[in-house]
């Protein structure tokens, strides 16, 4: 399921514009934002044209797997890389928040996937403060979802049911 803050925001926008598929526009927009962030990060690199071509090939290849989970991974990853490589703490925090909120279940795997980068940035580049930002954003997503689920019995029952039905369907 999608994180509660993002869900509520999208529902409000969808209610304002009922004839427009806000969810699809949001998904395409965030997909584009994530790859724009990757390309932005390459602007100072040598061989940037070659790297941009590779990024674009990956972008078009991933269109075949255009899902909330893939976009969540892309957004969160691009946000983390922006956080450590640029002085754009607010923008990168928003991108990470939206990425983790888009598919809450990807948080652990994104952290594991980027663990080496985070560790490197802490040890070599001494970017402990940025790691605290990352931890705060992650905790914020987890906390808002946890609080909402625990205070809304209908949602809690649905999530319990959905988790059990997913176990049956996945095996």
Stretches found by the model and what they are:
Residues 28-46:
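Transmembrane-helix motifs of polytopic, lipid-linked glycan transferases
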Residues 131-171:
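Juxtamembrane membrane-water interface segments immediately following transmembrane helices
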Residues 1-30:
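Short hydrophobic/aromatic helix or loop-helix immediately within or flanking a transmembrane segment
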Residues 52-76, 101:
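Aromatic- and kink-enriched transmembrane "portal" helix at the membrane-lumen/periplasm boundary
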Residues 57-59, 90-106, 115, 138-144:
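Membrane-interface alpha helices of multi-pass inner-membrane proteins
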Residues 78-91:
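Membrane-interface transmembrane helices that cradle and orient dolichyl/undecaprenyl
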Residues 42-48, 85-88, 121-132:
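Membrane-interface helix-boundary motifs at transmembrane edges
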Residues 109-139:
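Perimembrane helix-loop-helix junctions
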């Amino acid at each position: 399921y999608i994180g509660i803050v993002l869900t509520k925001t999208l529902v409000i926008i969808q209610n304002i514009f009922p004839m427009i598929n806000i969810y699809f526009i949001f998904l395409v927009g965030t997909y584009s934002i994530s790859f724009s962030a990757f390309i932005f990060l390459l602007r100072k690199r040598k061989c940037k044209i070659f790297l941009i071509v590779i990024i674009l090939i990956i972008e078009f290849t991933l269109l075949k797997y255009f899902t909330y989970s893939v976009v969540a991974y892309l957004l969160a990853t691009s946000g983390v890389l922006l956080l450590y490589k640029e002085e754009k703490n607010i923008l990168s925090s928003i991108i990470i928040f939206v990425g983790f909120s888009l598919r809450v279940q990807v948080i652990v795997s994104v952290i594991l996937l980027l663990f080496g980068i985070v560790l490197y940035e802490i040890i070599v580049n001494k970017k402990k403060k940025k790691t605290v930002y990352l931890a705060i954003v992650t905790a914020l997503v987890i906390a808002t979802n946890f609080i909402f689920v625990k205070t809304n019995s209908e949602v809690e029952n649905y999530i319990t049911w959905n988790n059990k039905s997913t176990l049956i369907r996945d095996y």
